[in-house]
Amino acid sequence: MARVKYGKVTRARRKRWIKLAKGYFGTKKSSYKKAHEQVIRSMAYAFIGRKERKRDFRSLWIVRINAAVRPEGLSYSTFMHGLKLANININRKMLSELAINNSEEFKQIVQQAKKALNK
């Protein structure tokens, strides 16, 4: 049987990992072993980061809503409870956008929530 050499295949596979390590510092971008280890680690960090981003944005929206509601004399939690009682189903992302860009419309929503709380 003829001898099989995997030079081209191995080189192509290694080049793929080196390509993924583009922009890394030192030997992590050029040495296959270091690049492979760092790319695996980077992918793990990226996976975790995609989960954390959802949490971070939700907390940012909550902070923005709270900051917009405080001058109206409500806390975030009472405001959200008022929205629930008033049957207003707007998610936190949209509420924070309204608070930043359309403050008049947001104030109307706050008034409706206050009205529902007083009933």
Swiss-Prot record:
<comment type="function">
    <text>Binds directly to 23S ribosomal RNA and is necessary for the in vitro assembly process of the 50S ribosomal subunit. It is not involved in the protein synthesizing functions of that subunit.</text>
</comment>
<keyword id="KW-0687">Ribonucleoprotein</keyword>
<dbReference type="GO" id="GO:0006412">
    <property type="term" value="P:translation"/>
</dbReference>
<dbReference type="GO" id="GO:0019843">
    <property type="term" value="F:rRNA binding"/>
</dbReference>
<protein>
    <recommendedName>
        <fullName>Large ribosomal subunit protein bL20</fullName>
    </recommendedName>
</protein>
<dbReference type="InterPro" id="IPR005813">
    <property type="entry name" value="Ribosomal_bL20"/>
</dbReference>
<dbReference type="Pfam" id="PF00453">
    <property type="entry name" value="Ribosomal_L20"/>
</dbReference>
<dbReference type="InterPro" id="IPR035566">
    <property type="entry name" value="Ribosomal_protein_bL20_C"/>
</dbReference>
<keyword id="KW-0694">RNA-binding</keyword>
<keyword id="KW-0689">Ribosomal protein</keyword>
<comment type="similarity">
    <text>Belongs to the bacterial ribosomal protein bL20 family.</text>
</comment>
<keyword id="KW-0699">rRNA-binding</keyword>
<dbReference type="GO" id="GO:1990904">
    <property type="term" value="C:ribonucleoprotein complex"/>
</dbReference>
<dbReference type="GO" id="GO:0005840">
    <property type="term" value="C:ribosome"/>
</dbReference>
<dbReference type="GO" id="GO:0003735">
    <property type="term" value="F:structural constituent of ribosome"/>
</dbReference>
<dbReference type="InterPro" id="IPR049946">
    <property type="entry name" value="RIBOSOMAL_L20_CS"/>
</dbReference>
<dbReference type="GO" id="GO:0000027">
    <property type="term" value="P:ribosomal large subunit assembly"/>
</dbReference>
